[in-house]
Design a protein with these regions (language model features):
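The substrate-binding groove and active-site-proximal loops of carbohydrate-active enzymes
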Residues: 1-6, 44-50, 89-92
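Solvent-exposed loop/turn segments at secondary-structure junctions
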Residues: 1-2, 31-35, 73-77, 91
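Substrate-gating cap/lid alpha-helix
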Residues: 11, 21, 32-73
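Hydrophobic positions in alpha-helices of CheY-like receiver
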Residues: 14-18
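A short helix->loop->beta-strand "cap" motif at the edges of active sites that frequently abuts
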Residues: 19-25
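Structural beta-sheet core signal
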Residues: 27-29
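Histidine-centered active-site loop/cap adjacent to the catalytic His
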Residues: 56, 60-67, 84-120
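Short, flexible, mixed-charge acidic loops at enzyme active sites
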Residues: 76-84
């Protein structure tokens, strides 16, 4: 398991490299997990006990960047887990979850391309 801090270091390097080549990086927050559903799938390793804290660390960093698409709320239940109806295995969003993510990306792009979100 990769710690949130390590992920942020890697994402920072990726962001900086993109910007050095004139590429505008756009971050999308990682999807939440549903440990209860993951445990039912025998071939997927259970997430670490502190997965929410590690994910929150990454999400907090992403939300501070110029361009971030936050999908957290749309995919999370009241406990901060991936909504059960959006992922059979508790890890990978199914069609409806992907539709929600796709719509968030489309909305962000439309806003960005029409000047509503300049990333500043």
């Amino acid at each position: 398991n990769i710690l949130g801090w390590d992920s942020v270091i890697n994402l920072t390097e990726l962001r900086d490299k993109c910007e050095s080549y004139g590429i505008t990086p756009v971050f999308i927050t990682p999807t939440p997990l549903n440990p209860e559903l993951i445990r039912k799938v025998k071939f997927i390793e259970s997430p670490p006990y502190d997965w929410k804290e590690q994910r929150a660390y990454i999400c907090d960093w992403m939300k501070q960047q110029k361009n971030c698409i936050d999908i957290s709320e749309a995919l999370s239940d009241s406990n901060g887990n991936l909504k059960a109806e959006l992922a059979t295995d508790g890890l990978h969003p199914d069609a409806e979850g992907k539709k929600i993510i796709g719509q968030a990306v489309e909305d962000w792009l439309n806003n960005y391309l029409t000047g509503g979100n300049t990333g500043e």
